[in-house]
Amino acid sequence: MGKYNLTALRVRQIAVAQQSAGKLRQTPKWLDIMHDVPPTEVLVRNRPQQHQLVRQRLKTVPGASRPQAVFEVQEKRIKPKKASRMFQPVEIKYEEDQLRKEFFRDHPWELARPRVLVEKSGKDFERYNWSRLQQRGKHLDGESVVQRQLWLLNNVPDMTKSAAYDIARREFYRLRLQEDIERRVAAEEAEATGAVFGPTRLQIGMDLENKEYERWKEWAKLQAQLSDQRMAAFLGAPEVQAAEEQETSLDDDATEKVAVAA
């Protein structure tokens, strides 16, 4: 075993010594804090805490007038790890992770839509009420479906994950269709009043594809010409070779006629 490096435990002592020697112009603000809360000196490392996945469900209990909230605890399976990874922090998982994975697996093109990731105060979620899918000040996206599905699971009695997913997905399709219709009608109204829009994304993509095809066609023609030139240099010019073969055949015919006449 190598020697223990206890330099981090002596940070305060070194700072005090440097201050008394006049090397520090100003006392560090953390000096008194490290005196009150010194770093641990225990060299035995404990295994990290195993986080549990707690799920809230409303279930109808026989004999009860109202559905009761039931908390289900799912223990995480402890997988054998290498000795070097034994003390690494355990990954924290939430119930939304599986719902989010399932939705974006079924709707991969939702990830291609632009999204706003900047929050004003970091507590924007407190203003949202997921009893309905569409929220004020938030664009409709896949995260709305995930939060709506989670709300249904936590607040509707005897709700299953598949049923909540179908309800949230149906509402999402209806609102997304409404947005597309509103966008199309707004564009038609603007064009009727004289507005001129540029090319759409589909048209831009087709133009880029056509340019790439024309560039490839020119490259293919050039490669074909170079291939023909290399073949001609190896076998000779096709026209000259054909003329030589024809001349040789005529000479052979003449020789045969002379031999027959003799």
From Swiss-Prot:
Residues 242-254 have a biased composition (Acidic residues). One of its GO terms (molecular function) is structural constituent of ribosome. InterPro entries: Ribosomal_mS23_fun (IPR016939). Pfam families: MRP-S25 (PF13741). The keyword Ribonucleoprotein applies. Residues 242-262 are annotated as: Disordered. Keywords: Mitochondrion, Ribonucleoprotein, Ribosomal protein. It is found in: Mitochondrion. Coiled coil: none annotated. GO terms for cellular component: mitochondrial small ribosomal subunit. Component of the mitochondrial small ribosomal subunit. Belongs to the mitochondrion-specific ribosomal protein mS23 family. PANTHER family: 37S RIBOSOMAL PROTEIN S25, MITOCHONDRIAL, SMALL RIBOSOMAL SUBUNIT PROTEIN MS23. This is Small ribosomal subunit protein mS23. The lineage of its organism: Eukaryota, Fungi, Dikarya, Ascomycota, Pezizomycotina.
